[in-house]
Amino acid sequence: KVEAPEIGDDSRKFGPFIKDYSAYFMSLNRGKESIALNLKNTDDKKIFDKILSKADILVENFKPGTLEKWGYGWKDICKKYPKLIYASASGFGQTGPLKELPAYDMVVQGMGGLMSVTGQPNSEPTRVGTSIGDITAGLFTTIGINAALYDRQKTGKGMYIDVSMLDCQIAILENAIARYLSKNEIPKPMGSRHPSIAPFEAFKTKDSHVIIAAGNDKLFEKLCNLLNISELANDSKFSDNSSRAKNMDELKKILENKLSLKNTDEWVKDMEKEKIPCGPIFNIKEAVENPQVGSRNMIVKAYHKVI
C-alpha cells in the first residue's frame, strides 16, 4: 500500500481510535504493508518501479489523470510491464463529463439513486448505514482483477480495468431501475418493505420487530398456517405474490395483529421450525456476538505490536 509521505491515508485520522491508532484504518487495511513514496521524486520513482517490476496487479484510486502526470498512466505502464494488471477505481470513472470530479461514498450514494429509495416514506434523505459506495467499488474491482488474471493465463498479457463508484451504485439497483425502465415509475423509499415481494419486511411483535421473508406462495401458506389464518392463503387478495404486493398495507395489518401476541424470540423459534425465512433485528453488539457469526470466524483477534 503506497501512501503519501507525512500525510498518509486520510483514514488514518478517522475514529474510533485505540492508543492513537485508527481502528477504522486497521479494519480496512489489515494484512497490508505500507510504504511512503512521493511519486514526483526521482529516487522514490525508482523504488516504485522496482516494486512494479515484480507486481502482478496495480490498484489505484486517484482522480483520473493523476498518475499520468507522474508517468504512471496505463499507456506508459503497459509498455514497461506488459503483464501487469492495472485497476483504476474512481468516483466517476476515466471517461464522461464528470470524470475529473472528486467523490466520496456519500456523493455516489446520492447521485446513484440509492438514497432516493432508502429510509422511511417522506423521510429526509437517508444514507445507507455502511459505506456501500466504497465497498461495492472494491468488490467490482476485485471481480475485474480476477477476470483479468484468468485472461492473462491464456494471453500472457496484462489488462486495464476502469471502475466507477457511480457505475457500481447503478449496477446494484436491480429492482428500482427495472421498475423505472419498464413502467416509467420512479421508486420511492419504502422502509424495510420490498417493492415486489410480500410479505417481505419487518413486522411488529409483542416486544419488538421480526423480519419475515416469505418469498413464494408455499412459504406464505406455511406462515398463514403457523399464525392460524390458513384461509388467508386462499383469499384472492393474497393467494399469489402479485396480489399480495398490491395489498401490502392490508396484509401487514392482518399479520401484525397475530404477531403482536408473542415476543420476537418466540416467533423466530416457531418460524425456524417451519423453515420460514425470518430473523430478529440485531444491533451491532448482538450481531457481533451472534454464535453463527463466531462459528464462521468473522470476528478474530489479531496481534498488533503497539496495541
Language-model region placement:
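N-terminal helix-loop segment corresponding to the beta1-alpha1 unit
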Residues: 1-144, 148-154, 302
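Glycine-rich beta-alpha junction loops
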Residues: 6, 92-93, 165-170, 207, ...
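Short Pro/Gly-enriched beta-strand edge/turn motifs at strand-loop
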Residues: 8-10, 181-187
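Short Gly/Pro-enriched turn/cap motifs at secondary-structure boundaries
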Residues: 25, 190-195, 200-201, 305-307
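Conserved Rossmann-fold dehydrogenase catalytic segment
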Residues: 94, 122-132, 153-169, 188-195, ...
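Oxidoreductase and adenylate-handling cofactor-binding alpha/beta cores
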Residues: 138-159, 171-183, 224-231
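Aromatic-enriched alpha-helical interface/lid elements that frame and gate functional surfaces
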Residues: 198-274, 278, 291
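A glycine-rich dinucleotide-binding beta-alpha-beta segment and adjacent secondary-structure elements
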Residues: 273-307
